[in-house]
């Protein structure tokens, strides 16, 4: 438990239907001096009720004194805006091919979503720090590969701004965008961005909230725990396909580079 807050105080803002506070007390103590990076997928947050639950949970973690960093997606919002503008896009191995028209739309949508998350947290009393390509960019990128256009791979994370925000008890809200040469904006896979940030911070946990229960084996059974080598085999054997491939690759990369553990959770479930 946070050293500066009593159990009685916690009970005042503990959400309805959340786990028993007495059960989670030990986890609060366990993580009070650790950093947690939470990536919430845009496919989950398109549902406003789920979005509101997410905002409530992040606010609670912040009030408990935990150091939480939020990285968000925005895929459905991007698709909706591209459709509205009659711009066609395609995917290669789960990554959106991004030309000049598309990157302009992606940047606009993700920054708006970043503001939406920040403003929603502010309404609950949390302090936030927004990070994207127009405000305190923290991700420098290099092009992922030519066929993907303006899709970037994180090359450098300016973690000093993240640490500053956390030290001020602010929640960093990070859009999966970065800048390359000539200040050109690049789209970044949300899981890739979250993994890069978690590695830089050496976070205790990287939590990927998605719109599925988790990762399944070749018998379609949910996997509760798995080692990096076995995850790589799931890709090799084509058990994992599509958009789950970069997610799994980022999980493996994270735990092999300083992150103590990665959890994939069904973000549609409250608390």
What are these regions (language model features)?
Residues 1-269:
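Nucleotide/pyrophosphate-binding catalytic subdomain
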């Amino acid at each position: 438990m946070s050293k500066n807050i009593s159990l009685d105080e916690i009970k005042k803002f503990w959400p309805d239907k959340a786990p028993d506070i007495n059960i989670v007390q030990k986890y609060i103590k366990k993580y009070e001096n650790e950093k947690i990076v939470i990536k919430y997928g845009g496919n989950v947050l398109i549902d406003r009720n789920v979005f509101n639950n997410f905002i409530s949970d992040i606010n609670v973690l912040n009030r408990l004194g935990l150091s939480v960093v939020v990285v968000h997606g925005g895929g459905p919002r991007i698709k909706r805006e591209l459709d509205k503008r009659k711009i066609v896009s395609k995917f290669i191995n789960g990554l959106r091919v991004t030309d000049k028209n598309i990157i302009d739309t992606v940047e606009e949508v993700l920054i708006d979503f970043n503001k939406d998350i920040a403003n929603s947290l502010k309404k609950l009393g949390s302090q936030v720090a927004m990070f994207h390509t127009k405000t305190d960019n923290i991700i420098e990128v290099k092009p992922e590969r030519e066929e993907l256009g303006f899709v970037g791979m994180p090359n450098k994370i300016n973690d000093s701004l993240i640490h500053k925000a956390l030290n001020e008890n602010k929640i960093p809200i990070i859009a999966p965008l970065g800048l390359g040469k000539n200040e050109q904006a690049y789209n970044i896979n949300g899981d890739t961005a979250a993994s890069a940030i978690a590695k830089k911070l050496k976070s205790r946990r990287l939590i990927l909230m998605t719109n599925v229960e988790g990762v399944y084996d070749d018998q379609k059974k949910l996997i509760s725990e798995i080692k990096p080598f076995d995850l790589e085999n799931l890709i090799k054997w084509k058990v994992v396909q599509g958009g789950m491939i970069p997610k799994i690759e980022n999980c493996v990369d994270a735990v092999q580079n300083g992150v103590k553990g990665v959890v994939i959770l069904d973000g549609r479930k409250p608390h």
